[in-house]
UniProtKB/Swiss-Prot annotation:
Family per record: Belongs to the universal ribosomal protein uS5 family.
Protein name as it appears in the record: Small ribosomal subunit protein uS5
Function: With S4 and S12 plays an important role in translational accuracy. Located at the back of the 30S subunit body where it stabilizes the conformation of the head with respect to the body.
Matching PANTHER family: MITOCHONDRIAL RIBOSOMAL PROTEIN S5
Domain S5 DRBM per the UniProt entry, residue ranges: 7-70
HAMAP family: Ribosomal_uS5_B (MF_01307_B)
Source species of the chain: Orientia tsutsugamushi (strain Boryong)
GO cellular component, one term: small ribosomal subunit
Amino acid sequence: MFKEEIVVEHLVNVNRVTKVVKGGRRFSFSACVVLGNKAGKVGYGHGKAKEVGEARLKALQNAKKYMIEVPLYKGRTIHYDVYGKSGAAKVMLRRARAGTGIIAGGAMRFIFDSLGIQDVVAKSFGSSNSYLMIAATLNALKQLETPRVIAERRGLRLNELSVTIYKTFHEG
């Protein structure tokens, strides 16, 4: 589906998982992957298999299946501040001026890099589990809409949005 558009692939983590059975222990591997095209599309997935390579491939297939599109402001940051949550992980994403860079910790950095976001400030609260952090970040990014979509939903023209919102969207 998005195969030709994928530019960046980040392997977030690989874990060895042990299942205890009657005859002893069975080992397998789980992998978490973030994919993106550096132009507003990103997805993540995880896979589990007996070999690391197979787990990575399953994670890639899973990530391709669940890619989302995120509107970017001037192709470099998000339109407005947003919050996301998944389980005990909470994230706050804030837009940033040009030249700020990606100020984010943990797995969030992989998502922003894959999306093509160059300037953003992100803070995580609660759990630092990478799976939850990625899910919380994507939940926050799913909430983003362009000012045009917001204005249409409210039945307004773009310049009729509140003055502060209009300035936010037009003064970098």
